[in-house]
């Protein structure tokens, strides 16, 4: 379900590594939603399946502030004063500045695109969109992956007041370099979407009871990667003239999350000023 066909992008690490950021580089891919990237995460994306019809009772429970799972993370708490400070500081951030904050590939909102189509099973619709979001985000991360080095980004964060900690196998919170965190998150998501017990592809197999919970966790991890890229690598996105593609992709992602109430608003705090701007512009509309 790739709704956009537009200019190619990509990176050839051997070619781009030695070129300065102010040198325009030719695109390397036909579409940004059709080809896997060659990032350091080394994920192998599964082939797209046409899932059979099935009936599910998918619903998303209210979000809780408790840790999400052994494989996922928790954030450092933010006080209202810190959040207000971040909002003030964020006014100077590139992705909130003109003209970038208004740049988009798609005019109007994604409301009709994210709504559940008639006669389509909710679980099928959720699964399809989650897989597409993951595939596209995986590609976008490939554009900036070579710049996400442990020396440059020793912690995974989304701005000055939001740090993301990984919960290891012993349920201990550990601070990781952004590159390691993102690779672990993408690998974890990749394993989830390729788990046929969680994302069944055979006719007649229902979605499991934990499907909604795992979808919430997958979407939260993807949001955190969005947040890191916006706060630290938006200049690379602009350098490649991909800000319209990126903003539209994020608007699509958030519209879907809001339509089905998948991500809690508190989790969106690092990008809330941007989301609110998109809402005012009519790019994000929800009930």
From Swiss-Prot:
Region annotated Disordered, chain positions: 1-89
Compositionally skewed regions (Basic residues) per UniProt: 45-56
Bias type Low complexity, positions: 34-44, 63-83
InterPro entries assigned: MOB_kinase_act_fam (IPR005301), MOB_kinase_act_sf (IPR036703)
Pfam family, one: Mob1_phocein
Modified residue annotations for Phosphotyrosine: 33
PTM sites of type Phosphoserine: 59
Family the UniProt entry places it in: Belongs to the MOB1/phocein family.
Protein name (database record): CBK1 kinase activator protein MOB2
């Amino acid at each position: 379900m790739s709704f956009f066909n537009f200019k190619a992008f990509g990176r050839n690490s051997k070619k781009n590594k030695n070129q300065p950021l102010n040198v325009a580089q030719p695109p390397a891919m036909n579409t940004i939603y059709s080809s896997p990237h060659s990032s350091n995460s080394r994920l192998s994306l599964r082939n797209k399946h046409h899932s059979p019809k099935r009936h599910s009772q998918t619903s998303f429970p209210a979000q809780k502030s408790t840790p999400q799972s052994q494989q996922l993370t928790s954030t450092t708490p933010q006080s209202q004063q810190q959040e207000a400070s971040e909002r003030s500081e964020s006014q100077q951030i590139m992705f909130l500045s003109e003209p970038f904050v208004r740049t988009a590939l798609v005019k109007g909102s994604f409301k009709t695109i994210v709504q559940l189509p008639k006669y389509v099973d909710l679980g099928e619709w959720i699964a399809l969109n989650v897989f597409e979001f993951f595939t596209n985000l995986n590609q976008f991360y490939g554009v900036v992956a070579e710049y996400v080095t442990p020396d440059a980004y020793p912690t995974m964060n989304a701005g000055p007041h939001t740090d993301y900690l990984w919960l290891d196998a012993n349920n201990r919170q550990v601070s990781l370099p952004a590159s390691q965190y993102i690779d672990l998150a993408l690998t974890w998501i990749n394993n989830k979407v390729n788990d046929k017990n969680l994302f069944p592809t055979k006719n007649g197999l229902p979605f499991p009871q934990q499907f909604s919970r795992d979808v919430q966790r997958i979407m939260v991890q993807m949001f955190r990667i969005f947040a890191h890229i916006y706060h630290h690598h938006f200049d690379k996105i602009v350098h490649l003239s991909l800000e319209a593609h990126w903003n539209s992709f994020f608007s699509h992602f958030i519209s879907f999350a809001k339509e089905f109430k998948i991500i809690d608003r508190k989790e969106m705090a690092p990008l809330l000023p941007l989301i609110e701007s998109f809402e005012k512009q009519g790019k994000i509309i929800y009930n």
